[in-house]
Amino acid sequence: MTLTNLDAIVVGAGFSGILAVYRLRKLGFRVQGFERQERLGGVWRENAYPGAAVDSLFPFYQFYDAELLQDWEWGEQFPTRAEMLRYFDHVDKRWEISASFEFGVSVSAARYSETTQRWTVTLEDGRRAEARWFIPAVGFSSVLNIPRIPGMSRFRGAIYHTAKWPHDAVSMRGKRVAVIGTGPSGVQIIQSVGKIAKAMTIFQQSPCLTLRKYGSPNQTATALCMRPDDHREALRLGLQTSNGFGYVPRDQDTLDVPIEERNHFYQQRYLAGGWAFWMAGFRDLCQNIQANRDAYDFWARRTRARIGDVTKRELLVPQIPSFAFGIKRPCLEEDLYEIMDQPHVKIIDISNQQIELITETSIRVHGQTVECEAIIFATGFGDEASGLRSLHIRGRNGIRLEDAWSDGVESHLGMAIHSFPNMFFLYGPQCPTLLVNSPAVITVQVEWLCEIISKCQQAGICQLEATSKSHCQWEKKMSLLWDKTLYHTHARKSKKTAEANKEEKTWVGGLILYRRELENCLANNLEGFQAWYVEETALL
């Protein structure tokens, strides 16, 4: 059976998929969404591990529609997974989004036909759906990163990944637990499980740089008392800042400020909680290595004072940083270091010598054996393109996305790809995923997407494809910004980009400049795209 009476197919029911379906449907387009989980929520439906919560500044982690707040009140400054799922249920009630989604089904392939100028999406059960426009909204947190460690299948205890936490997971209370990874999910699970585990061993690839989650109690109370109009104004202002959170960096270079004044400013930003120290610090934090080290040294002094164990102190907060401060998104914490300083918690550095083996009851590393009853992988996800690659997409002439990106990701505006007409991916590689509030990025992308599709319909455009030249131009624009920062000092490389000696660059110019690029494309006659009109294709 093939579902054919569609204008657009959306894959994924997280923030981007929900908003795309809602906005396109409002414009009168016939839209069908597919989601592998049983309900709306995206990563929040899947990430059910203990301690899972939002770490973004309040009130910016929500849909930018204050009307949703007429009968909704946030109960937490940093909403837990449970509250986020209630929020998605509320959105569904107001927008009736589930009516346009089929749940519990995965997409196994997607292919473009030059004959029909339509996409055919194949589902895992063999059914198909066809539409003019194909919109993968799978983000970059959909394919798990699980290290291949010999002996995993022999382990007699429980093995979990934070992004695939089962509803029937055993309690960690009184257990000997191993946590592999100290990224955002690792930081959250260490704080929750560390309080109840009999013993916890943390396997650390690199030290996590963290910031205080909360500022003053008054700050929390004020945030939760915001009215719908207050939210509307905050969200409006957020879209006018580079990071989408309303944070504005101090318009001075670090070393131009006397040291006493500098430290006083650092203290204010540090105590403000959230990402104020990172996003509202001096403007050259991520451009100047000396300025960056100055900020790190202040943070390290404050943080090292919280750790009594000398060995742990050097592992967790080394005097010389492993990488520049802020080029990896800082995690937010409440009592992380106090928990890791406890005698029942052990930290093992695996930066130079990886885990050797998992046995029936233990993990072997550095010639020692760590007995455990549960292993938690807090190892995150694949690279930013892994979600798109997992859909097995084929474009013009049957070209596979994996082959088109064999030497690394290439795109136009971080949304479109040459040889893949009428396909726009949302919140994926080469858009502002690193430094900007995700709902803000998604908001401007979906606004632009709706304008593009509407313009094509009005103009009689049946095929719209990014040019190969636009890839080069976007790469050049990204590089001009990227090379001025410290991000290149710790750039991630996938296996493919490492072989090609290419960095996995992304857009680090922030939201305002990115939005301007999208607007310029529209204003300049769909710059970077080639269009085919109905009359032209009829002659082919």
UniProtKB/Swiss-Prot annotation:
FAD binds at residues 43-46, 55-58. The record marks 329 as: Transition state stabilizer. Gene3D superfamilies: FAD/NAD(P)-binding domain. Its cofactor is FAD. Loline alkaloids show broad-spectrum anti-insect activity, and different lolines may have different biological activities. In vitro tests of NFL, NAL, NML, and semisynthetic loline derivatives with long carbon-chain acylations on the 1-amine have shown that many are effective against both fall armyworm larvae and European corn borer larvae, but the effects seem to differ depending on the modifications. N-Formylloline reduces the weight gain of fall armyworms by deterring feeding, and does not significantly affect corn borers. Signal peptide: none annotated. NADP(+) binds at residues 53-55, 182-188, 205-206. Induction: Expression is induced in loline alkaloid-producing cultures as well as in planta. It is an enzyme of class 1 (oxidoreductase). One of its GO terms (biological process) is alkaloid metabolic process. Pathway: Alkaloid biosynthesis. Keywords: Alkaloid metabolism, FAD, Flavoprotein, Monooxygenase, NADP, Oxidoreductase. Binds 1 FAD per subunit. Its EC number is 1.14.13.-. Pfam families: FMO-like (PF00743). One of its GO terms (molecular function) is NADP binding. InterPro entries: FAD-binding_Monooxygenases, FAD/NAD-bd_sf, Flavin_mOase-like. FAD-binding monooxygenase; part of the gene cluster that mediates the biosynthesis of loline alkaloids, potent insecticidal agents composed of a pyrrolizidine ring system and an uncommon ether bridge linking carbons 2 and 7. Lolines are structurally differentiated by the various modifications of the L-amino group and include norloline, loline, N-methylloline, N-acetylloline, N-acetylnorloline, and N-formylloline. Belongs to the FAD-binding monooxygenase family. This is FAD-binding monooxygenase lolF2. It comes from Epichloe uncinata. The gene is lolF2.
